[in-house]
Amino acid sequence: MIAMHYLIGLKTKDDVQMVRRRAAERGPVFDGMPGLAHKWFLVDPQDPAYGTFYLWNDPAAAVSFLQGPFFHALCQTFGRPDVLLLLPTAKTLPADTVPRAALGDFGGRLGNMPAIETLDPRSGAKIDLAFGETGKGRQFEIAYHARA
């Protein structure tokens, strides 16, 4: 299993609305995508940004995605983002759909909160995705959650 994350800065709050619409329209295409376990479409309306966080069961499927039409369309719309490939070190997924998530290095201090903890093998940085209201890290709305 590998994780993948990228973040795209948006110019205006109108762009945030466009990303929400895009997530609602395109999100279902990712449901059941071969090799993909989960994809979270993330939106930060305060500091306008669009992000994604993927969990892939099959690394070859992640490569196919990055070389395929969906990622190409994203690059045409927003420019090519810096994609982080991450190694999951711990995973506790929420039982139900949650509306919010946070990204950051929480250093295992989330208690029983559902989270995916990852390690960037290039830099050694920890990048965690915590589900729910954390009060820590960068806060996001979950615009869509695609799953296998």
Task: Identify the function of each model-found stretch.
Residues 1-37, 47, 61-66, 80-148:
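Short S/T/G/P-rich N-terminal loop/turn motif that feeds into the first structured element of a domain
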Residues 42-44:
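Short beta-strand micro-motifs enriched in acidic
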Residues 49-51:
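Short, surface-exposed coil-to-beta transition loops
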Residues 55-60:
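Long compositionally biased, domain-poor regions of proteins
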Residues 70-79:
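A common structural junction motif
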